[in-house]
Each structure stands twice: as structure tokens, then as C-alpha cells.
Amino acid sequence: MTVKVRFDKEVREYAKGEKVKDSVLKITETALAQALEKFHRRMIVIEGDTLKKAELAGILAGASARVLSDIVGELIEKRLRDESEDKIEVLYATDALGEETFGRKRYEAFRKHFDVLAGSEVNVTAVTFKHTREILGRTYDLLILDMSYDYSPNDLGRIIETVRGGGLIFILAHPFEKWKDMWTGFHKSLVTPPYTIEDVKKRFNRRLIRKFTQHDGIYIITESGKAKKKPKKSKSQAKIRARKGVEIPEETLFPKELYEMALTRGQVEVLKAFEELVDKEGMLVLTADRGRGKSVSVGIAAIGLAVALKKRTRIVVTAPELENVQSLFRFAKRALEKLGFKPYVVEEKGLIKELYARKIGLRYYPPAEGYKKNADLYILDEAAGIHVPILHKYLNKPRVVYSSTIHGYEGAGRGFSVKFLKKAREKRSFKELHMEEPIRYAYGDPIEKWLFDVLLLDAEPVELTEEDYELIKRKEVYLEEPDLDDWFENDREDLRHFVGIYILAHYRNRPSDVALLADAPHHEARVLRLKNGKIVTAVQIAKEGGIPKNVIDKMAKGYKPRGNIIPDMMVKHHYLKEFARLKGYRIVRIATHPDAMDMGLGSKALELLEKEAREKGLDWIGSGFGASEELVRFWVRNGFAVVHLSPARNPVSGEFTAIVLKPISKKAKELIKKANDEFRIRFTEWLGDTHRELEPEIARWLFETPFGEAVDYPIHLTEIQKKRLDAFTGKVLTYDTVVDAVKPIVKLYFLDGWMKPYLDERQIKLLIYRVLQAHSWEETAKLIDRTEMFTMIEVRDIIRGLWYYYKRLLT
């Protein structure tokens, strides 16, 4: 079917009255015709520094909405949009919509012309970047993205991907020559003492501008109508091809109405895979690029399963954030309505959190909570954004579905496959499905290519050869500070390799991480290169400290400066104001090439970074991270002292955050030892309260110290307590009657230096779990896989040895 994509006489006369050149209308017509014919998106960037650019966007978007409204019926008939989507949806996103703000003025200038031309069959949604959560899971035909003052790369990824094939994106931008030297609101958020806005770089803006000019499908005009980048030839009609028909299986367990909602073969396969979970328990792993309808399919299939089970069905839905599952919930709701249900929806801040209909219930829980709930089905959406230990908590569930984006603004990458699926295969068999056919837009969409390129969403590390592994074994590596100007300005492959290591090795990456590296004055990169130049370890550091006295005094009273995470913690939690004057490197992220893990490269990078810091006259190096056993052990074994542990677990990773420090200067050593001693004292008490559920194998490493000395902390026992300890170790009294006397002895052990009685791993875990965390004998016996009687005897034997050793110190 061929449709005419030409603005009518009324539009042309209106545009002429507003002094809009006919050539600009033709660029817009051509862009829309191309988008409709290819089922791709197209972008028009409007440069300018007055309200004219918003007015021009209003005219061009209004004219486009008018054309789309005329053909919406044909688009539904061709299965390019759902029958419920019978109105043209327009999204306007800007930094501010409050009265008297420039963002509001631009929006009003846009609406002044848009409302005249667009017609009544159009819905307009206006949001600020702070509220883009509300649009997730929705799809739009036209987007006006006001980037005149502020935006963050996260906003860019999130918003652009809501536009469907056949749609247009209008970018309101400053003149490029001016924009490349401008500071945005995002830049202001990067200022941290002792730096000023003058120190903030503009590398990311320049990269963005360059990518506008390099990629196909993007046209650039000025607010006065000058075309700086236009289509090679004009186009005023589009041949619209129907989406390929989907073959519905003759025999299905799920209602046919649900299969009729499927737009691609991939979605049908998801429904069939869910059918296999009706009669038997099982696990399904579903992966896809963005825009493939993955979450939509899971939402529909979950309802199919609930109906087919013919019983009260509870479904736990989890994802890194509630915003990640909005498509899933919306289509689950639509599926229920298709089947004649009247679903009840519970929302939180405009986002669906719970969905109920008769005997069916879907509810969202944070990843660290969901596995504790009883349910018939567990769905983990955007699973690559959930920390691996939490993913494993769901592995033994009877029916579980892991669903994940391989690329996209969540920044998942192949890390999900590398870090989780490999180990999951050893524990359980499961079915894997990969969805390839796009739903929101067709293959080869130029805007997707542009987005992936500008935000480095598909970056991957360099390939390693056998020769490379030999170099790694011999540690023929060197640490280098790359020239970030060169990386970003000249689009070096090294930048992609650097970011690619993080995408594969880290559980969560966001586009703003790249902009932070590009522009933050206190952030720098270091790379560990092989002799042949290949990057095998990526390190991102933040320079912290050197804070003026007046700011330190404010910090002590509660002020929290941006950045300076470690100095702020040392001032607030350890009252060591002088630490904030010292300078150091906070290691923001350190990751090794996934094919070169456990080969000592991370430790080598730390060794060389410490050497560099020493040569530069810095006082310390440190880091903050999710406290897993593996990571705490890594940092402690590299000579770092633990100085803080957060009181609550991260809701996504399920981990407490630890902060570690390694002194370089004499003054830093004195202060860090004080903080480490204080932390160890506090930790003996926290384990019975805020950290009672902390895994003992992690706790044992948090007690380790690089200083080798006992904490100067007086332990006092009365003469009666000493006699009762003698009676307990002599099998006269039971443990429960002498806890008050046992606990100080165990504290003494954990606060001691290196010259203390030897205990093996199991014995250390027993003391932490039973004595400091006060778990029951039953729970403690389960921990070491022994009987309660054996556990009681072992604890008595350990205490006997400790009491014999420390008795002489307490006389």
C-alpha cells in the first residue's frame, strides 16, 4: 500500500505565514516518508538559541501528526501497531516545565503552533527529564526532545527508545558551535570541591554533536531554515509493508486471544515456552536486544500460564527498578482484559506495582526480597542488571523465568551470559530463547545505530590470543593514563575496549558512566596494557580530598559535597576532619577482561596504581564496593583496611557497601589505622544487630587488618564471670548460661592482631554466627552441616582454647 506523505495546502499556507521555508517542509516530509516506508525512525535536529526553534518544531511536528492521523487505520490494518493505539501519541521532554522557566516557555511556543495543525486525534504528553520513569513501557509516534539546557545520557537512552518505527524525533539544540563549549545542568552536577565549573570538560557534548553529523537518518536544520544536513533526494510517498503474519499453532494450552496479541514469531515462541511450565516445573532464559518485545511477551505469557494452571496463582516479578517492568505489567493487564477480566491495579508514583484479577496476582518486589516470597512463578526481568549472587537465589525455584536485554540503555552486555548462565548450567537444565525480530521498529534502524554508537551500548573488549595469555602469565604489562581528549575526540577503538570490559565484567552500567568519565574534572582512567598495547584491565578513578577547611567544617555539620565519598565518610563516621585535607584516589571501578580473570591482573593494576600515587605525593588510595566474599577478600589481600560498612543492603545487589583504604603517607597511615580499629570495635556489636544477617564468610574478611596490631580496647570480666568461664570450658555450665562471659573473649579474638590463636575457616564462621550474631544452635548446625550436639561441642572446644590463651591477659 502506497500512502501520500505530503503536507496539505492548509499546512503549507500556515507555515508560509510563519516564514517557514518550503525546503524545510520537504525535509520533514522526506524524513517521515522514509520512516514509514522502512518502519524506522528519523531524526531532525533544530539548531538555535531563541524560541523560534520550538515554534518550528511545533509546525513540523503538527504537520507530521496530521499525516499520521490520516493513515493510522492503515497502520493498524498492516499490524504495525495495536488496534488499541488508534491515536497519535506525542512526547515532549524537557528539563523544566515550571512557571516562568525557559523550558516552559519553549514548550508553550511549541504548543502554540502544534495545536493548530495537529488535529484532535492526537495525545500530547509533556514530561521533565526527572520524571521519565513515567513514560517507560509506553510508545510514541513523535518525540520532541528539548536538549537546550540540560539532559543526561541516561535520559537520552530511555527517551529515544520509546519512539516507534514510522516516527520522527525532533531535537531542540543550541547552535553546535556554541553547544560544544557549553556547560549543561549535568555538568554542574559534576562539580565537587576543590574543583569549579571551569574544570568540567565538554567531551561528551562534542561526541554527541559529531555523531549527529556522522550517522544516516539524521537531518540538521537551523531555526531560520538553513539546511546543514539534508536527505539526498526528496520523497513524498511511502510504500507501507504489512508486518509478516504470525502463524498461531493449532493446538495451544493458552487461550487463542493471547496468541493473537503476538506480532512476531519470537513472541509466539515465548508463549509456547511458557506453556511447557504448565504441567511441569522448569526454568526459562529469554534474551533480546531492546525493542524486541521481550517484556511484553513475558507479561502476556505470564497471564497465559496463570489461567492454564487453573488455581490461585501468585507471580513474583522482580527487576533492578520498578520502572523496568512497566511494559510487562501493561501487557499483562491488556491480556487480562482480552480474556474478559477486570484487573485491579496498584500504582506507586505513577508506576504499576501490583496487578490482580480473580485468582491471579502479580506483584513487584526488589531483587533482594522477591526470592523470600512464596509464589507459583518467579520472573526476573532485566536480569543482567541484578547482581549474580541474587540471581542464584532464584535458581532453585520450581518455575522461574530470567529475561534480559543484551544491549540497551540498561547497559547489560554479555555479562549476563558470562557471569551467570555459565554457572547456572552446572546446577540446572533450562530452555534458552533469543528474540531477534524487532517489534517497535524494523531491522537496521539508523537511530538505534546512532544511539548504540554515541552511548557505547554495544562496546566489547578486544579479543585475546594465545600469545596474549603468555604475556599475561609473565605479567608483561604496564599501567597507562590514556589521553581522554584523544579517546573521545577521535573516537578511538581503545574507548570501546575500555567500556566493553565494564559492560562484560560489571553487573550494572549506565550511559551516564561514560559521560562521567568524559567530563567530570575529578574522574580519570587508567588501563593495564599488554606489551602489544591491548587493554586487559580497566580502572576508573576519582581524585578526592584536598578539601578547604571551611567546607570540611560544613561537612562535619551534615553538608554532603558531591564526589569526595571517602573524605565525607571519614569526617562524618570517624570524626577525622584532618583526613579531608589529605589527597587520594578513590577507585570507582576496576575490572579485568572476562577472558583473563583470576590471572592476577587486578592485583597488578592496584600495585602499579599505588606506585603512581606514591610518586605523585598522594596520601591514600581507596574504594567502595558491594561486599561479596570474593571482593572483600581481594581488597584485604591487597593490603587495604576496611573502615566502613553500610547499615543496609543495596536493594538491587543485596549487598552491604564496604569502604576500604590503603595508606601511602605517614599521616594517612595514622588516621586509617584509627578508622580501621574503630570499625572493628563497632563491627563486633553491629553483627548482633544491623548486620545480623550478613554472611559469616564475608564478616570474617571484614575483620582482617593490614596493620597486624591488636585494637586498644579494654575488655573487663568480673571474677565471677571468669569462674563461670572455667565451669563452661570444664563442661559444668552450658553455653546459654555464660553468653555474657563468652562474648567478650570472642571480641578479644577478633580485635587482636596477627599474633593470636590459629582458628580455621569453619571455627571462625562458628564464632561469628553463633556468638556475635546470636543465631540458634539449630541454624548454626545447618551452617556447618553438622548435628546440634557436634556444634555445641565444637563451640565449647574453641572457647576453651581462646579462654586458655586470653586468661593471662585478664588477670
UniProtKB/Swiss-Prot annotation:
E.C. number(s) listed in UniProt: 2.3.1.193
Major location category of this protein: cytoplasm
Molecular function as annotated in GO: 18S rRNA cytidine N-acetyltransferase activity; ATP binding; mRNA N-acetyltransferase activity; rRNA binding; tRNA binding; tRNA N4-acetyltransferase activity
Keyword set, alphabetical order: Acyltransferase, ATP-binding, Cytoplasm, Nucleotide-binding, RNA-binding, rRNA processing, rRNA-binding, Transferase, tRNA processing, tRNA-binding
Positions bound to acetyl-CoA: 590-592, 630, 637
PROSITE patterns: GNAT
Gene Ontology cellular component list: cytoplasm
Binding site for ATP: 267, 440
Induction: More highly expressed at 85 than 65 degrees Celsius (at protein level).
GO terms of biological process kind: rRNA acetylation; rRNA acetylation involved in maturation of SSU-rRNA; tRNA acetylation; tRNA wobble cytosine modification
Compartments reported by the entry: Cytoplasm
Domain N-acetyltransferase positions: 474-663
CDD domains: NAT_SF
Reaction equations catalysed: cytidine(34) in elongator tRNA(Met) + acetyl-CoA + ATP + H2O = N(4)-acetylcytidine(34) in elongator tRNA(Met) + ADP + phosphate + CoA + H(+); a cytidine in RNA + acetyl-CoA + ATP + H2O = an N(4)-acetylcytidine in RNA + ADP + phosphate + CoA + H(+); a cytidine in tRNA + acetyl-CoA + ATP + H2O = an N(4)-acetylcytidine in tRNA + ADP + phosphate + CoA + H(+); a cytidine in mRNA + acetyl-CoA + ATP + H2O = an N(4)-acetylcytidine in mRNA + ADP + phosphate + CoA + H(+)
A family per Pfam: GNAT_acetyltr_2
Protein family (similarity comment): Belongs to the TmcA family.
Listed PANTHER family: N-ACETYLTRANSFERASE 10, RNA CYTIDINE ACETYLTRANSFERASE
Functional summary from the UniProt entry: Catalyzes the formation of N(4)-acetylcytidine (ac(4)C) at the wobble position of tRNA(Met), by using acetyl-CoA as an acetyl donor and ATP (or GTP). Catalyzes the formation of 404 N(4)-acetylcytidine (ac(4)C) sites in RNA, almost always on the middle C of a CCG motif. There 173 ac(4)C sites in rRNA, 35 in non-coding (nc)RNA, 119 in mRNA and 77 in tRNA. More acetylation is observed at 85 and 95 than at 65 or 75 degrees Celsius.
Full protein name: tRNA(Met) cytidine acetyltransferase TmcA
